[in-house]
A protein has these predicted regions:
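Bacterial N-terminal signal peptides that target proteins for export
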Residues: 2-17
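Flexible, surface-exposed loop/gating regions in the mature catalytic domains
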Residues: 33-283
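N-terminal secretory targeting signals
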Residues: 28-32
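C-terminal motif of bacterial Sec signal peptides marking the signal peptidase cleavage site
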Residues: 23-26
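Core hydrophobic alpha-helical transmembrane segments of single-pass membrane proteins
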Residues: 19-21
Length: 283
């Protein structure tokens, strides 16, 4: 959870210099050639703070693992939460080791997709008219990484209530990011609560034309229960794959690389050297 919300909006001194250096590295990586993408929709749901074994104790989550793709050897890249969200969306933790809000350079997946004219939206449960930084709990700005880049809330970040109409309409965004609130992501509530939420949201996605026409849904957990191993569950839900299991070593950078390849854009930061999760994707 973000500490102090907007108390440390500015990144100062040596930290700012370090971030600028990291931004330069991330930007240079973004020019790497991308795999030719199929015109499919990509969905990402990020849950919270449970190990793979804990997540699989929930019946609906376990049923997805039995039916679709499972990354058995997938690890988050840091503790606490925020650096993992940044890794998933920019290919870097930016050297951060806390859950506070920081203004980072606009070198992220959202900016990348906007510049490439690829449609995208990030659906945040609990987001209100008070915006990305000031919406009340159970919304958490620390679980909304797109608000960090450039220090502002992009127009693409919207309340989760807009997902249903977008899925049922003719123009579902090519990239869909979904953040549950702090109860439904199991940060503050039992795994069973998050499992029920997933049943509803995954059902809505897999019933949509966007998913049925070749869409791919990734479900991951930002970090485990603070162990050094940081082993988390990541599922790949797509038609035509059946149950698949991969023992390859994957991380959040692998997931970002896979998403960028599917959307036809270059890889950012450490995603540039990551192994994509192609063995769990439909051919």
């Amino acid at each position: 959870m973000v500490v102090g919300r907007v108390a440390d909006v500015a990144v100062k001194g040596w930290a700012a210099l370090a971030l600028m250096a990291l931004a330069a590295a991330a930007c240079s990586s973004s020019h790497s050639p991308a795999v030719t993408a199929k015109p499919r929709n990509v969905f990402v749901i990020v849950m919270e703070n449970h190990s793979a074994s804990e997540a699989l104790s929930a019946p609906f989550t376990a049923s997805l693992a039995q039916r679709y793709g499972v990354a058995q050897n997938y690890h988050a890249v840091a503790h606490p939460s925020v650096p993992n969200y940044l890794a998933l969306t920019s290919g870097s933790t930016w050297g951060l080791q806390d859950d506070s809000y920081h203004v980072l350079p606009a070198s992220d997946l959202g900016t990348q997709l906007t510049n490439a004219h690829v449609t995208w939206r990030a659906y945040m449960e609990g987001l209100t008219s008070r915006g990305c930084l000031d919406s009340p709990v159970p919304y958490d700005p620390g679980h909304d990484p797109f608000a960090y880049y450039g220090g502002q809330c992009p127009a693409n970040v919207v309340p989760l209530s807009e997902l249903g109409p977008d899925l049922n309409g003719a123009a579902t965004p090519r990239f869909v990011w979904i953040t549950p609130d702090m109860c439904h992501d199991t940060h503050n509530c039992d795994v069973a609560v998050g499992d029920s939420w997933l049943r509803q949201e995954v059902g809505q996605i897999t019933a949509s034309p966007a998913w049925k026409s070749g869409g791919v849904l990734f479900i991951t957990w930002d970090e485990d229960d603070s162990s050094s191993d940081n082993h988390v569950l990541t599922l790949v839900v797509a038609q035509g794959t059946g149950h698949r299991s991969s023992s390859k070593p994957y991380t959040h950078y692998s997931l970002l690389a896979t998403v960028e390849d599917l959307l036809g854009v270059g890889r950012l930061g450490q995603a540039s050297g990551a192994t994509p999760m192609s063995d769990l994707l439909p051919s």
